[in-house]
Amino acid sequence: MIGVDSKSSSTTFIETMVESEKTKHTCLRLEISGADPIFVKGTWHNSRFDISVTDGSSSWICNATEEEVAERAAQWDQPVSEYLKLAEQYLGFQQPNSVYSFSDALEGSKRLSWTFEKEGTKLEWRWKCKPSDDSKKITVGILDFLMEANIRLSEEVVNKTRSFEKMRSEAERCLAQGEKLCDEKTEFESATYAKFLSVLNAKKAKLRALRDKEDSVRVVEEEESTDKAESFESGRSDDEKSEEEASKKATSSKARGGKRAARS
C-alpha cells in the first residue's frame, strides 16, 4: 500500500482546496481471497470521497456524495468525520482482520465491501462501484499515481539515508571528540596529581628539615643549659670549699687564742 498526502507532493492528482479543505489520496493493492489483486485509489475530502478501482484491464468508480456519506453515517450512528476516517483506514491500508470482497453486481457494476468489529459485533460496509467510461484513463491514472508515489518514497529514502549518514558521521565525530576530551581529562588529572604529589613531598621534606633544625637547636640549647648548670655547680663547690676552709681557719685561730689566754 502507498499512501500520499497530495499537499506535500506534486503528483498528477492535483490537490483541490474548498473552504480550506485538504484533499488526501491513498492507493491500496488489495488482496482478495480467491481472486486476483485489485488496486483501489481513494480521494478523501472533508465530507465525501471518490474511489477508483482497477484490475489491470477494467476499472470502476464510486463517487460518494456528501448526502450519501451523511446518510450512511447516520445509519451507523456516526459523525461524518468519523465515518470517513474509518473508511479511509480500511481502504487506505488493508486490515489483517477484515474480510474484503469485490463481487459482481447488476449492469457490470461491482460491490466493494469490507468487514470490521464494533463492540464485539462483526459489521460490513458496502459501496457500489459503477463501470468506468474510460478504463484506460483510470488505470493509467492509478499507475501514474503509484509511480509518482514510488519516486517520492525513493527520494525520501535517499534523503533519510543521507540524513542518517550525516547523523552517524556527526555521532562518530562527537564520539571521537568525547574520547579525546576523556583522554585530555585523564592526562590533566594525572599531571595535576603528579604535581600535587611533588608539592606535597616538597612540603613534607621542608617540614622534616624544619623539624631536624628545631631538634638540632633544642639539642644545642639543652647542651648549653647543661654546661651552664655544671659550671654553676662547680663554682658553687669552690665557694663552699673556700668558706669551709675560712671557717676552719677561724675556728683554729679561736682555739689557739683560747689556749694563750688560759696560759696567761
UniProtKB/Swiss-Prot annotation:
- Tell me a Gene Ontology molecular-function term this record carries: DNA binding
In the induction comment, the record states:
Slightly induced by gamma radiation, but not by white light or by UV-B.
- Give the keywords, sorted: DNA damage, DNA recombination, DNA repair, Nucleus
**Residue ranges with Basic and acidic residues bias:** 213-248
Q: Which GO terms are recorded in the biological process aspect for this UniProt protein?
A: DNA recombination; double-strand break repair via nonhomologous end joining
Chief subcellular site? nucleus
Renumbered residue ranges of the record's region Disordered: 213-264
Subcellular location per the Swiss-Prot or TrEMBL entry: Nucleus
InterPro entries named among the record's database cross-references: CbamoylP_synth_lsu-like_ATP-bd, DNA_repair_prot_XRCC4, XRCC4-like_C, XRCC4-like_N_sf, XRCC4_N, XRCC4_N_sf
> May I have one GO cellular component term?
nucleus
Outline the subunit composition: Interacts with LIG4 and specifically binds its tandem BRCT domains. Interacts with POLL.
Q: What does this protein's UniProt record list under function?
A: May be involved in DNA non-homologous end joining (NHEJ) required for double-strand break repair. May bind to DNA. The LIG4-XRCC4 complex is probably responsible for the NHEJ ligation step, and XRCC4 may enhance the joining activity of LIG4.
Q: Which family does it belong to?
A: Belongs to the XRCC4-XLF family. XRCC4 subfamily.
According to UniProt, the name of this protein is DNA repair protein XRCC4
Whose protein is this, by species?
Arabidopsis thaliana
Q: Which gene encodes it?
A: XRCC4
